A protein has these predicted regions:
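Charged, alpha-helix-enriched surfaces in structured cytosolic catalytic cores
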Residues: 30, 68-71
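Short, contiguous, helix-prone interaction/anchoring segments in small proteins
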Residues: 26-46
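N-terminal flexible/basic segments that precede or flank functional cores
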Residues: 1-33
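DNA major-groove recognition helix of helix-turn-helix/homeodomain DNA-binding modules
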Residues: 70-87
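Residue-level detection of the helix-turn-helix DNA-binding "recognition helix"
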Residues: 63-64
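Long, contiguous binding/interaction regions
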Residues: 92
Length: 92
């Protein structure tokens, strides 16, 4: 199954990202790749323009070797209709 078979709207994208956060080892790699996969499910130009980044920057920042700034992550998520929410950690 391809990611674009699962990502149909903002809600399914949020579910996908939340699952990837659970699988992430703490280095952000799973989340970064997940955001990259969601970007590919959209028209990349429609994400790049409101996020004020180039298409090439998007592909570069959200691949396995990417290292996007927190600001870029927020702008890209907002351009996709998503946001970040902080919750208390369970069983710390």
């Amino acid at each position: 199954m391809d990611v674009d078979d699962f990502i149909r709207d903002d809600k399914s994208a949020a579910v996908f990202l939340n699952e990837m956060i659970k699988l992430d080892s703490g280095d952000g790699s799973m989340v970064r790749l997940a955001i990259g996969n969601i970007i590919k499910c959209h028209n990349v130009s429609e994400i790049a323009k409101p996020a004020c980044v180039s298409r090439a920057s998007l592909y570069s920042a959200f691949n396995k070797d990417g290292n996007p700034s927190f600001d870029m992550v927020q702008k890209v998520l907002a351009a996709m209709g998503l946001g970040i929410q902080f919750v208390p950690l369970e069983n710390r």
